[in-house]
Amino acid sequence: MKKISANVLILILLFLAGIILLQACKRHHIPPNNNPVITAFAPANGPMGATITITGTGFNPDALQNQVTFNGVTAVVSTASATQLKVIVPVGAGDGKISVKRGGVVTNSVNDFKYLYTVSTLAGDGTVGHNNGTGAGARFDIPIGLAVNMAGNIYVADYGNNLVRQVTLAGTVTTFAGDDNNAPLNAPAGVAFDGAGNAYIADTYNNQILKITPGGMVSTLAGSGTPGFANGTGTAAQFALPFGIAVDNSGNVYVADTHNNRIRKITPQGVVSTLAGDGNAGLVNGDGAVAEFDFPNGVAVDAAGNVYVADTRNNVIRKILPAGTVSTFAGDGTAGLVDGTVTTAQFNYPCALATDVLNNVYIADTHNNAIRKITPAGIVSIIAGGSSYGFIDGIGTSAHFFDSHGIAVDMHGNVYVGDTGNSSIRKIQ
């Protein structure tokens, strides 16, 4: 009986030792790492629709189980294996990291992907005229200011035709304003929309700012019709060849009062004041009337209410805070074509600018025949054109523009250009 008990005890001890050994092995066992890792991608740049190969480890062989983004923009994964993904560059990706998400774990590329913008012609064929139509069948005469409404339609201040035109996403052109004898226009140079769908027109040679309701009612928001300089309400105010126009989220209208070298502000009630500028041509920063501009052409406003000015003859971009303080946002004042930081970059007669939802600023750098971009980090680059003047669609700098005076950006990041010298509307995506 004692001998049996001793054997049982030995078996129990061996069993317990086995359990302890097994648990020790479990504690020291390191499971394989199946988290995704990007080791490389190629090519390093590309336009929308290009195929990029991402190599690494930990990818899911089921393409749908890998979520890939370029600079935060979702891409389509066409094929997948555990070590390689083939993905399609999404429209408007921009420069930035490539990210892969699998099973809740995200990995980012070490290097940034360089997005190449594609330029196409939305409407017009380079021939001067005033025909409505679709695509190359439409005609413009000195298209300058551009705006995009909430529906995504593009509006063009067709300066030489004394009209404002509408261009749909399909490229169909119709006349929006100016062909009615009750509201004739005289060389309109700017157009903008507010959140309620009201249109505002800088009726340049009539020295007035017009308002058109969604129902088609036209009224004079401000301006007497006589060139001059006066603050006041409605027609008591005066402008001198107003060009650019923009609207903030509160419905305030900002005007590049070009020949007065001032930036004006109009409330929804039609009260006109001077936001910045003393009327003298110069390059002076400071508060309100201390600041000076030289032939400011374009204005844009961001979501925070900051106003950006294409200070044309100064070859710089200015920024005005809501309180009226003016600073030089980009450019060193020398006419040239230099990318880089905002303090070292150079522009040549910039005439128009626009902001997007990510706070990038796009510039029609007119005499450089280039479209430039300024990121929130303060980096200036050419996204299209810039080699020489011409009328060529293509990718990046292989595309050509001619004396572009207008620019606008829609909610999806598509950029539209009033290609003035080519009598056409171009699209960049």
Where are these regions (language model features)?
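Sec-dependent bacterial lipoprotein signal peptides
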Residues: 1-23
